[in-house]
């Protein structure tokens, strides 16, 4: 498809690599290292820079910026010529898709006009099951087209959800809101974000966590202490 601005004729592109949320960072680093070795084995590739956790800082403005997460990584790839870059993209994309089936891997060239995907299709409706069925049918139609090299969707993997039985009359009598209960659960599990500090240009998040008397994570969620954020009277 044509865009308002064509892709830049440049000797560099970047590769987005995204594993499902919750994937160990060691797995991400290992896969990125093997991809880097593969790319450097190709004669048209001159240099590869790898980043884990997000888009490298102070990079450039003619590209998309990824949301920070330790399940994400990037490879910035330099080529001998723009022509070699363009000629090798389909072969490399096919290799990455075949060898890393658990990951979302996409090669992207630079463009003055940001576009997430060359072709996008959106379904809306109240029933997730119907939406998933329509998505699968549309994906199959696209995969049957030889000119299309990558088909994906924005459905994230289903994950367990912790639900709290909040009984408002009793909670109000002791001054506890839904937010108080939610923050206490967050502190006992992943940790409640309370700030950040910087190591150079890199921001590191700070979390407050509830622990037992021995400094260990609280195992029984029924025993989590809950405090109100409002001062007591």
Residues covered by each model-derived region:
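Short beta-alpha junctions and helix-cap segments that line functional grooves
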Residues: 2-3, 60-64, 118-120, 191-196, ...
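Helix N-cap motif at beta-to-alpha junctions
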Residues: 21-22, 80-84, 127-128, 168-171, ...
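Short, low-order "capping/linker" segments at domain edges
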Residues: 61, 117-127, 167-169, 208-210
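Transmembrane helices with small-residue packing motifs
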Residues: 1-21, 104, 118, 145
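Solvent-exposed, membrane-proximal periplasmic/extracellular interface segments of envelope transport
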Residues: 1, 27-113, 169-190
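A short beta-strand structural signal in non-transmembrane regions
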Residues: 14-16, 72-90, 120-124, 204-208, ...
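Beta-strand-rich non-transmembrane domains
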Residues: 132-233
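Extracytoplasmic
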Residues: 10-14, 43-47, 70-74, 100-102, ...
